[in-house]
Structures are given as C-alpha cells and as structure tokens.
C-alpha cells in the first residue's frame, strides 16, 4: 500500500488490487474536491521559463506563468467558462509583444490565450479549444467516483448448509472457484497448457524473439503487429466483430455460437465466452476450457508489455531469450496462472476468518489487515534478537528451540515411569557455569545477580522466556486474533522479584538524574562551560522522555550541520566553535550539540508545534526569503512557490501535508526537486529554533568554550566524575559527593513512567536488544502510532527513550580473555592463547596495555550479542586474520590521519564554497585524491584492527536471519488460509496451528509441521506416491538436509546458530522452494537479501542455476563518490574493504564440516 494523490485528492493505492480508496481524513471533502478538479489552471499551457536561453525571455515567460496561474477554465452545465483564481488581480501594463506563439506549448491555444492576456472578451465557443483537456479530467473524475462506489473486493462470506465459506464474485473468480479443490489442480494446469498450444506455435515464438532482438525504440509497433498476426487478431476485422455480436443476441450458449460462426479464432472464442457466456452457462469440465485462451493471452501480453514495449535498459537480449524460449514461456505462464488460482483459494480462507456472514471484503478492510500483519512482521527482529541473546547468556549447546525449557519437568515414559528432564537453568548449575552466566547477565542487565539463589535465577530466566515466547507465538506463529497494539501485552506473566527490582531501579528518579549527569560529563560540558552557567541551564531545562512522534520534523544534528551554510541567507547570528586544537574543537561542538539538543527536542518543539507558536510566521518568512532572492526576482519564478497555498492551520497537519507531497512526487522528480521539500522544512526549523533561542535569552550557548580558562574548578573533573559513577553502578548505597549533588538538585525531569507489569516485561526484552534493533523497534512503533492516529505504545516509546540514555554504552568491566581476541590474530601462523602471547604480539598496545586487555566496543558487542565461535570458523575459512604488520601500519597511519582529514576538509571547502578569486586546480584534485585514498586505507585498517568488520558481519548475518523468519511466518499464514479456503467444512484445521495440543481433539501431538504431515497423509490416503513423500525414511533425510517443510523449523527455531549445518545459500534455496506456491514471494527472498546487503554497504548479484542452486556472482563494496559535479574523472572510494567483501561471501557459503563416519 502507498499513499498517493490524484488531482489533489489523497488516496491509499493498493497496487495488488489496482484500485484507489478514499483516505478516511478526506471523506467529508471528497465531493467538493472532485468538483474542483474541473477547474483547470491555464499556466499549464505556458512553457517553463527555464526552457528559454536569454534572461529577458525567462523573466517575460515567468510573468506569463504567474498571470495564467490565476486564470481558470471550468465546466458547468456542459458549457466552458473563464474565471479568476483566489489571487487578487494586480494592475499591470501589458503589450501584444509580451506573449509570443513560441511561449505556448501548443500553437492551437495561442490565439485564445493571447486574448485572455490582453484582457479582451472571450466567449464560450473560443474556450472550446480546451474541451479535450477538460474531458480527460472529467473521465478521471468519473473513474475516481466509480472507484469510490466500487470500494470493495470481490469476495463475500456465505453460509451454505451450515458451512461458512467465502466465494469470489468476479468472472475470474468464478473460474478459480471451479478449481478450488487441489484434486482439480492437474486439470487446471492441463487446460492452461492446451490453451497455450492453441495460441502459440514454437516457430512463431522463435520468430517473435528474433523480431525483439532486432528491435529499435521506434519500431515497437512492429512487434505488436507481428504478435497480433500470431494470435489471429488481424483476421477479426470490425465487420466480422459485428457479425459475432449480432449472433450473440440470438444464441444462448457457446457451442451453438461456434456452429454459426465457425471462423472465429481460438482467442476470439475465449474472449466471447468469458464476456457473454461464462456467468450464464452451467460450467462443466468441457465448456470451462473456453476461458483459458483468454487467460493465457492476458499473461503473454503482460510479459510483452513488461519486457518489450516498456523495456528497461537493464533487461538484456539474453534475458529476453530465456523468458520467451517456447518451453520456458509455457512454464512461466502456467506458473503465473497457477499462482493466481492459489491466491484465490488463500483469499477465500483468509476472508473466512475475518468476515461475518454476508459481509463483503472492502478495500479498507483489506488494508487494515495488511497493515496489522506488516507491523507484526516488523517486530520479528525483536523476538529473534532477544532469543539469540538469551541463548548467548545461557551459553547453551542445545540445538533445539529452548523457549519453554527454562524450568525442568517430570515426564512419564511409555511404561508410566517418571523421569526428570533438566531445564536450561538446571544446566547452569549441573555444568558449573554460574560465573560465566553471571558475567553474561551483567553485560545485558547491569545487575548484581545472586547465582546461589537458584529459585530466584530460575524465576528470572522463566520471565525472559515467557516474554520472548509471548511475542514469538504472536508473530512467528501467526496469531490471527492478535492486533498490533496488543503485541506487548504479555498477558498472564507475573514479573519475578529480580525483574521488579531491576525495573523499579531503572525508573528511579535519582538514577535517572545520575544518567543525565553522566551525559553532561561525557559531552564535556563541565570542561567547557562555567559552573554558574551549567546550573542556570539546568534550572531552565526540563528533561523529558515522552516521545514526540511528529512527521517530517528534522533531527537536530541535521540542522546543526547546516548552520554555517545557511546562517547568512536566513539572517541567523552564529559563531562556530573553533580552536587551534582539532580534538578540543570537536569536544566543544559535542558539548554544544548536547545542550542545544535538549532544548530543541523539549521546550522548543512544545512551543513551535503548538497553536501558540510562531511556526506559520517562520514558514512564511522562509518563502518570502526565497521569493525575494535576487535571481528569483529576475525570473519571477521561485522554488518554494508550491508551498504558498497549503491551507492547514495546525503545524503537525502542515508537515504531514508536505510529507505526503514529498512521498507522492518522490518517484517522479529529480534529486534537486526532491531536496526542495526537505530543505524547506529544515530551514523552517533552523530559523525557528535560532529565533526561539534569541527570544528566550539562550543564545549564550553559542559562546561555549570561550570561557574555558575561567572554568578551572570543573575542567579537570571528568575522570573523577567517571570513577564515582562506575562505583555507584556497583553499589547504589554509597554517598553522592556534594559537588555532584549540587547539579543533581537542579536537574528537572518531566513525568516519570509509572510501574506496570506489562512495562516490566517489555523492559526485560528491551535490555536484550542491540542498538540497531532498538532503533528499528522505535521506528516501527512510531509508524504504527501515526498510521492508526492513536496513543498506542506511548509508554513503550517513553521507556525506549529512557533506556537510550545509556543503552549503547560499553560496560567497562565485562570479561574478555586473551584467547577470545586471539581467535582472530595471526601470531607466527598460530592463534594467540594467553596474555603472555598477546603481550608479545601487541607491542603497539592496541589490545594489551602491559597488564590488562584493552576492551574495544566492537568486541563487547560481539560477546554480548554475538556468535564468537561461528565468526571464528567463518574467519578461518576466509583466511581472515590480523597480523603484527597490520597493527604497526595502523599505528603509523593513525598519526597521519588528522593531516589527511584536514587536507580533505580544506580542499572540499575550496571546491564547494570557493572564496573570491579562488579556484579548484588540477593540483588540488590530485591532492584531494591522495587524501581520500589515505583516509580509505586507514578506515579499512581501523575497522579490521578494532573488530568493527567482525561486528558488522555478525549484525548482517543476524539481520538476514530475522528477515527469513518473517518469510516462515508468511508461509504458516498462507498454509492456514489455503487449508481453510479449500476445506471450509473441516473443523480440525485449527488444531494444526494450535499450540495447546492437550486441548485438541484430533491432532494431539507434535508441532505444526508434524501435524500438517498427518493431515496431508489423511488427505492423500489413496495415493501411495504422495504418502511416501513423508515416509519415516524420507522424513529423516528431509530433516537432515533441512529441506521441504523442515527448512521452516530450521529458520523459525533459529537453528542455523550455532553450528550452520547447511550454508546460508542452501537455506535460501530451500526457503525459496518452500515458497514456490507464490512466485512474487519466492522472488522476494533474494531481493530482500540484496536490499539488506545494500544497507550494509555491499552490492551483490546472485545467480540461480537450472538446478535452482544459488551462487554469488559478484559481491563488491558500495562506492562513495566524491566531488560529484566536478568535470573530471570521478573520484571514488570503497565503503567496505575487499577483505570484508570476501568475508561476507564466505559467510554465505560456510557450513559445518560433516563428521566423518567412524569405521
């Protein structure tokens, strides 16, 4: 679904349904705005000023454009009339020479436009020249009105003999309904093949391909003509069509018509049957065949349209040959039509669940369900990351799904004997892993766990398990009853004592104030701002965590980065922090950003976005500045003119309108035009913010850093404050020094979250997520809020904001051993095993300072969220190791990097903003090239040495696995809908998908896959071949190879980790096969992987062989283009190193070596 506008009316466009639906917010204004479509502005007939060469003509045509933008032709009672727009008429001098024939897009309109311009009377007959354009608009309006009235899908729920079922009511659906049962599938396919053979001979298709190969852009009509000859359309002349139509009036069935008109082509027979007889004759296996030529030809025409008539430049002749090879073409069309039949059956099942008797599936109804499903699938990453983190904390070797297995339980065997089965928590104690698990828990929850209290620990792990399972069973296992807003309800889960203490401590007022104090210290505020100024800032600032979900509000960091460039044009007073020491300058900027950011997101947005703010005053000022720019005054044309007529009176609605315009036009405009929207909004907020600071006496923050010399009392306190904060983390009972308390007393907080059990469980989940997943979750919840216009997830978003105060901070006291780092180090051909070897290896003190291991953030993340052993195996296979030489090179390059950054910065300024008499020379070009090459080399080396590349690899792998889990959820949903659609009378289908087997009547054992296999065997009990597909021997092989239904379990239960029994490429192959019932879904798998790779800076091409095996054709780094508009050879650097590209390629190919059988 996407939002669009047609003639100024907001719609939701459902591309799969092909219809436009009124947006709810527009319902009351639709008729009025539809009528407004008939008002046609005449400036559309005047050429753009920029299309002329001379400045005089640009200015003259600009004035014409402006004049005619206020003149409209409208239709009333079938008569055309002229009227003025809303703008006031301005007295002006005019002359016949002001408007020339060359200024008008179409010469036939020139005479009447000239009369209008010269203020001469124009009658309705003269206005008839615009009739055709008005007619086109009228057709558009009628189409829209029909769309609104037809605002429904062709499905209705009925009750037939006490069996609730859904049927399609369109003509196509009548055909599909005839073949609803899978037993008729073979006959359906046979009819498709037969129709294809009737329409197309192999030699004709071969000739068609030759014609396409020799095609030029201007000769596409020849392909159409040749194709029409193939299907016999040229023989159906107009008089022949009249003969057929006359006969149809007197003939009641297709057979009789063919007898009377025997010369009809196969296609014409099919089209006539579909149009005139399909819903009149009683369908049987014989007459229904008539419909299939029509179906096949539609698919063929669509292929020609996509690959020939509207052929894209990236479609090669080889691809055309493959697609249109006779047997391939036949199979492709067969699959497409089979997919459509399957989709119909699934839709019948879907609407059976959601509709009441007699109810029709409307487009709005469909959209709501799609939106809910899409939102829930976006949350899959939450459950999968949390699940991986749980496994990592437990250090479990269990390859099976561990949810529901925290506690041990007593079970009975076949003989009735009781046996205790250990839970995952039991294993911590049985395998003596208490210390390791305690350290792992501390990395996530920063809490001092008492591992000697086993019951308390078991309750805590059970809480985490229940919270994860609650989400997984709602999403991964597709819960029909679950609404998006209830995904984090965590019903019937009581927080354990540890959970309560931990969460209550997190939302404690004193702890929150200390977090803010830590941020002030980290941002170097105490070093660069005098004490009395800090205290004054704190007195005037309120720190809030409430989420401000406002569309199109620019981030503060984006605005800050543009202040220097925009300060003159916007009339802003600004002093950029600058010292002789680059590090010091950066620290001052960090402090300034932190202090200003709190004001921006707090009191400023509260004021600016309110009805009492000056939002509209500032926005008008920005438009006026653009309008009065010297260059625009000459032409009379200015970019921001398009925003002048926006009528919304509330800032939030104004922004939503601009965001809508941006999204609608994004695909049809060049980058410069798209940037206009973002640039306009950024200027409004930047000007508004700086005005707010000036009006509220807070501009003094501009001068931060200038009083450093007088701030001796706090300048050197950073480390002292850090030490205290670390001690306080370990013991909250220690006394807070007066010096810190003085600041804490002045920190004011907004409303603090109140404790609820639901938020307590949500908190446990959040602490298991990495920073990226937490950001994605926040975005998903904000989008849900916006789409549903409700306050759902407000508390959850506030909690995320609260945790973001320090969620991505590295805990310094996490355990890190030399042999863990040593897995990726090359010490004379071996891995480093202990501190002694690490000291010898690392003479540059990058990993070891002589006494202690230096802890890099990336390795902290790898240990906390990662797959250390799997990463080691992938790195070993890729030959990826850090050498002593690389450490030395890194240390040397580190000393030179500031010089290279400075060189790039200065030369880029010279290129982008040259001073008077300054020119970017060839020598500058070469120096810039050398600087960016040095920076690239250093950056890649740094990312390797500091383990950033391994951390990226882990994040990439995890992201791909999350996405694949989403596909298994869709498969489960589709299976459920297909079975319900095909067998609406079967009352036991729901038991296949019910997890509480003890409540089931028929399917009492096993998970979804096992229960479905039982159903499958019952369905095909008389077909030995199909039953044998899931024999015990075959199931054993399928499980081992993770094929067929068992790839679903392998992905959904996250069994790829830790051992990678099959490669990621094989996972993709097997998943595509599982999804082969839907071509779009199957093809989407690889597209989503390519998109994820692109997000991480890789450009990949996969190849799929005739045997359906997937391989990597190319995998390269994304290129970063520098000095884009310079008329020289493009300067490009690689975002990722070649070594990392190789590592990613190996990641896709890696799988655990098979154990050799012992003989």
From Swiss-Prot:
Changing residue 314 to A: 20% pre-crRNA cleavage. Changing residue 299 to A: Wild-type pre-crRNA cleavage. Its cofactor is a divalent metal cation. Residues 880-946 form a coiled coil. Residues 139-151, 172-176, 224-233, 271-276, 294-297, 301-305, 336-340, 371-378, 780-783, 962-963 are annotated as: Binds crRNA repeat. Changing residue 473 to A: Decreased cleavage of target RNA. Changing residue 1082 to A: Barely detectable pre-crRNA cleavage. Changing residue 1108 to A/R: Loss of pre-crRNA cleavage. The record marks 601, 771, 901 as: Binds crRNA spacer. One of its GO terms (biological process) is defense response to virus. The record marks 41, 86, 659, 904, 1135 as: Binds target RNA. Residues 995-998 are annotated as: Binds 3'-end of target RNA, in adjacent protein. Residues 1-11 are annotated as: Binds crRNA repeat and spacer. Pre-crRNA processing is metal independent, while crRNA-guided target RNA cleavage is dependent on divalent metal (i.e. inhibited by EDTA). Changing residue 601 to A: Decreased cleavage of target RNA. Part of a type VI-A uridine-preferring CRISPR-Cas system. The X-ray structure in complex with crRNA and target RNA shows a crRNA-recognition lobe (REC, residues 1-360) which anchors the crRNA repeat and a nuclease lobe (NUC, residues 361-1159) which binds the spacer crRNA-target RNA duplex and cleaves target RNA. The target ssRNase active sites are within the 2 HEPN-like folds, which interact in vivo to form the functional active site. The N-terminal region and HEPN-like fold 2 play a role in pre-crRNA processing. Belongs to the CRISPR-associated endoribonuclease Cas13a family. NCBIfam families: cas13A_C2c2 (NF038188). CRISPR (clustered regularly interspaced short palindromic repeat), is an adaptive immune system that provides protection against mobile genetic elements (viruses, transposable elements and conjugative plasmids). CRISPR clusters contain sequences complementary to antecedent mobile elements (spacer sequences) and target invading nucleic acids. Unlike many single-component effectors, this CRISPR-Cas system targets RNA. CRISPR clusters are transcribed from pre-CRISPR RNA (crRNA) and processed into crRNA by this protein. pre-crRNA processing yields a 5'-OH and probably a 2',3'-cyclic phosphate. This is CRISPR-associated endoribonuclease Cas13a. It comes from Leptotrichia buccalis (strain ATCC 14201 / DSM 1135 / JCM 12969 / NCTC 10249 / C-1013-b).
């Amino acid at each position: 679904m996407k939002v669009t506008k047609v003639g100024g009316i907001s719609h939701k466009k459902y591309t799969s349904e092909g219809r436009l639906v009124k947006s709810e917010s527009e319902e009351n204004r639709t008729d009025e705005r539809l009528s407004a479509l008939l008002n046609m502005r005449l400036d559309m007939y005047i050429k753009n000023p920029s299309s002329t060469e001379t400045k005089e003509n640009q200015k003259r045509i600009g004035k014409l454009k402006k004049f005619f933008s206020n003149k409209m032709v409208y239709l009333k009672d079938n008569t055309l009339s002229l009227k003025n727009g809303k703008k006031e008429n301005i007295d002006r001098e005019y002359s016949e020479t002001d408007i020339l024939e060359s200024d008008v897009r179409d010469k036939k309109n020139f005479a009447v436009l000239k009369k209008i311009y010269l203020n001469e009377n124009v009658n309705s007959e003269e206005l008839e020249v615009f009739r055709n354009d008005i007619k086109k608009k009228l057709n558009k309006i009628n189409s829209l009105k029909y769309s609104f009235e037809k605002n429904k899908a062709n499905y209705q729920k009925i009750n037939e003999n006490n069996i609730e079922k859904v049927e399609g009511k369109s003509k196509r659906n009548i055909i599909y309904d005839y073949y609803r049962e899978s037993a008729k599938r073979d006959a359906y396919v046979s009819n498709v093949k037969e129709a294809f053979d009737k329409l197309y001979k192999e030699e004709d298709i071969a000739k068609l391909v030759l014609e396409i190969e020799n095609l030029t852009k201007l000769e596409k009509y020849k392909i159409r003509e040749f194709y029409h000859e193939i299907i016999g359309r040229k023989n159906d002349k107009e008089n022949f069509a009249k003969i057929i139509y006359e006969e149809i009036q007197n003939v009641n069935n297709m057979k009789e018509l063919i007898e009377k008109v025997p010369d009809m082509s196969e296609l014409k027979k099919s089209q006539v049957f579909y149009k005139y007889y399909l819903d009149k004759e009683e369908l049987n296996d014989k007459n229904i065949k008539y419909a299939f030529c029509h179906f096949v030809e539609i698919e063929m025409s669509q292929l020609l349209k996509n690959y020939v008539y509207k052929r894209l430049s990236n479609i090669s002749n080889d691809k055309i040959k493959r697609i249109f090879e006779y047997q391939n073409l036949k199979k492709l069309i067969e699959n497409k039509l089979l997919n459509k039949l399957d989709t119909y059956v699934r839709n019948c099942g879907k609407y059976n669940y959601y509709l009441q008797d007699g109810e029709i599936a409307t487009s709005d109804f469909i959209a709501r369900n799609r939106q809910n499903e899409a939102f829930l699938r976006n949350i899959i990453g939450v459950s999968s990351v949390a699940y991986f983190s749980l496994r990592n904390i437990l250090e479990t070797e269990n390859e099976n799904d561990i949810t529901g297995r925290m506690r041990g339980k007593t079970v009975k065997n076949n003989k009735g004997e009781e046996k205790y089965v250990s839970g995952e928590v039991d294993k911590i104690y049985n395998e003596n892993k208490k210390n390791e698990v305690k350290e792992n828990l501390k990395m996530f929850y920063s809490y001092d766990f008492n591992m000697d209290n086993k019951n308390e620990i078991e309750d805590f792990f059970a809480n985490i398990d229940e919270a994860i399972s609650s989400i997984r069973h709602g999403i991964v296992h597709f819960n029909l009853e679950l609404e998006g807003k209830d995904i984090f309800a965590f019903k019937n889960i009581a927080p354990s004592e540890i959970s309560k203490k931990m969460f209550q401590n997190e939302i404690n007022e004193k702890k929150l104030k200390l977090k803010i104090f830590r941020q002030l210290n980290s941002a170097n505020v105490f070093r660069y701002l005098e004490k009395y100024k800090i205290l004054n800032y704190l007195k005037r600032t309120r720190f809030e965590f409430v989420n401000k979900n406002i569309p199109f509000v620019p981030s503060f960091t984006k605005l800050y980065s543009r202040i220097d460039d925009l300060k003159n044009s916007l009339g802003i007073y600004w002093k950029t922090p600058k010292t002789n020491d680059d590090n010091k300058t950066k620290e001052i900027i960090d402090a300034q950003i932190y202090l200003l950011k709190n004001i921006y997101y707090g009191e400023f947005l509260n004021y600016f976005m309110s009805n009492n703010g000056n939002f509209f005053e500032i926005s008008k000022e920005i438009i006026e500045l653009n309008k009065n720019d010297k260059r625009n005054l000459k032409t009379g044309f200015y970019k921001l003119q398009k925003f002048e007529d926006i009528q919304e009176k509330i800032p939030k609605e104004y922004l939503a309108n601009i965001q809508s315009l941006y999204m609608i036009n994004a695909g049809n405009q060049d980058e410069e035009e798209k940037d206009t929207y973002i640039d306009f909004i950024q200027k409004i907020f930047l000007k508004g913010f700086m005005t707010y600071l000036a009006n509220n006496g807070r501009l003094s923050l501009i001068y931060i850093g200038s009083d450093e010399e007088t701030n001796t009392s706090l300048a050197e306190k950073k480390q002292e404050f850090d030490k205290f904060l670390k001690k306080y983390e370990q013991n909250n009972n220690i006394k807070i020094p007066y010096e810190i308390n003085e600041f804490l007393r002045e920190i004011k907080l907004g409303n603090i979250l109140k404790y609820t059990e639901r938020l307590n469980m949500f908190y446990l989940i959040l602490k298991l997520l990495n920073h990226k997943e937490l950001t994605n979750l926040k975005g998903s919840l904000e989008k849900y809020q916006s789409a549903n216009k409700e306050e759902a997830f407000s508390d959850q978003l506030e909690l995320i904001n609260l945790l973001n105060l320090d969620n991505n901070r590295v805990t310094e006291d996490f355990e890190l051993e030399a042999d863990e780092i040593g897995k990726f180090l090359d010490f004379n051909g071996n891995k480093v095993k202990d501190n002694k070897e690490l000291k010898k290896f690392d003479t540059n003190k990058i990993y070891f300072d002589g006494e202690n291991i230096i802890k890099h953030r990336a390795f902290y993340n790898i240990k906390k969220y990662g797959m250390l052993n799997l990463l080691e195996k992938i790195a070993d296979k890729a030959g990826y190791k850090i050498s002593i030489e690389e450490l030395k090179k890194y240390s040397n390059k580190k000393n030179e990097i500031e010089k290279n950054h400075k060189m790039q910065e200065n030369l880029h300024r010279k290129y982008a903003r040259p001073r008077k008499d300054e020119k970017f020379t060839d020598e500058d070009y070469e120096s810039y090239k050398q600087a960016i090459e040095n920076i690239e080399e250093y950056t890649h080396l740094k990312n390797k040495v500091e383990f950033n590349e391994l951390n990226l690899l882990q994040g990439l792998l995890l992201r791909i696995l999350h996405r694949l889990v989403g596909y298994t959820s869709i498969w489960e949903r589709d299976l459920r809908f297909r079975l319900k659609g095909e067998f609406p009378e079967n009352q036991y289908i729901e038991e296949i998908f019910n997890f509480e087997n003890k409540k089931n009547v028929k399917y009492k054992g096993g998970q979804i896959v096992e229960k479905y296999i039982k159903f499958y065997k019952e369905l095909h009990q008389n077909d030995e071949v199909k039953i044998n597909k899931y024999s015990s021997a075959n199931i054993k092989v399928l499980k081992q190879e993770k094929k067929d239904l068992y790839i679903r379990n392998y992905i959904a239960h996250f069994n790829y980790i830790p051992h990678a029994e099959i490669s990621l490429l094989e996972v993709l192959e097997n998943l595509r096969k599982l999804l082969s019932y839907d071509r779009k879904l199957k093809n989407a798998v690889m597209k989503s992987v390519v998109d994820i790779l692109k997000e991480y800076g890789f450009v990949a091409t996969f190849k799929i062989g005739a045997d359906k095996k997937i391989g990597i054709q190319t995998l390269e780094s994304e290129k970063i283009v520098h000095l884009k508009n310079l008329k020289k050879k493009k300067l490009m650097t690689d975002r990722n190193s070649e070594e990392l590209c190789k590592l990613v390629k190996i990641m896709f190919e890696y799988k655990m070596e098979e154990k050799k059988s012992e003989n």
